[in-house]
Regions:
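Hydrophobic ligand-binding cavity/cleft-lining segments
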Residues: 1-42, 46, 50-54, 156
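Intrinsic-disorder/low-complexity, polar/charged segments enriched in Ser/Thr/Lys/Arg/Asp/Glu/Gln
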Residues: 2-6, 42-44, 57-59, 73, ...
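Preference for bulky hydrophobic residues occupying beta-strand positions
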Residues: 5-7, 45-49, 76-78, 95, ...
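Short acidic, gly/pro-rich beta-turn/loop elements at beta-sheet edges
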Residues: 15-17, 54-59, 72-74, 86-88, ...
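Hydrophobic pocket/interface hotspot
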Residues: 16-20, 26, 64, 108, ...
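Glycine-rich portal/gate segments that line the openings of hydrophobic small-molecule binding cavities
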Residues: 38-80
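Beta-strand/loop substructures that line and gate deep hydrophobic ligand-binding cavities in soluble
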Residues: 61, 66, 80-128
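A conserved amphipathic terminal alpha-helix motif
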Residues: 117-153
């Protein structure tokens, strides 16, 4: 199932790129996500998602499949198992960033595959959940980006 989300952040594309490719920095912005381990370009963690009446918690791994700085395009592969053994989830997430005046337009395309209880919900419900999560993520991300102590661009 393909989900598409579009949003804008009020920082230049270079800053948006530096931020969105810093998984450790942006993970806390994602509702229900928790980063537990970083091993080079591999990230382990868990995410809790409410879909309809079901709350699913997945434990898994994500890694960059593509990081093209000149095109400001990044592809992340993620997969996880429901911690209660009630299914799996896998996603290929592509983020494309383009300059938009003094800000950046970001288009996120997610190719999502889920099994288990969550899979009973159709594309409409999943798209609504995705839209809500991305909305909360963007709000949190904007606040972080606009903090004067923002570390974007630093390596550490």
């Amino acid at each position: 199932m393909e989900l598409k989300n579009e949003f804008r952040v009020s920082v230049p594309v270079e800053q948006a790129w530096a931020t969105l490719t810093d998984v450790e920095y942006i993970a806390p912005c994602m509702p229900g996500a928790q980063l537990t381990e970083i091993d080079g370009e591999e990230f382990k963690g868990q995410v809790k998602v409410k879909v309809g009446p079901i709350t699913a918690q997945y434990k898994g791994v994500a890694k960059f499949k593509e990081k093209n700085e000149s095109e400001h395009r990044v592809v992340l592969d993620a997969s996880g198992r429901d911690t209660r053994g009630a299914g799996n989830a896998a996603a290929e997430v592509t983020a494309e960033m383009t300059a938009d005046g003094d800000g950046t337009k970001i288009v996120i395309t997610t190719e999502l595959k889920v099994t288990g209880k969550v899979a009973q919900f159709g594309r409409g419900v999943m798209a609504d959940v995705s839209e809500k999560l991305i909305g909360q993520f963007v709000e949190s991300l904007e606040q972080k980006l606009l903090e004067p102590s923002s570390h974007v661009g630093e390596s550490g």
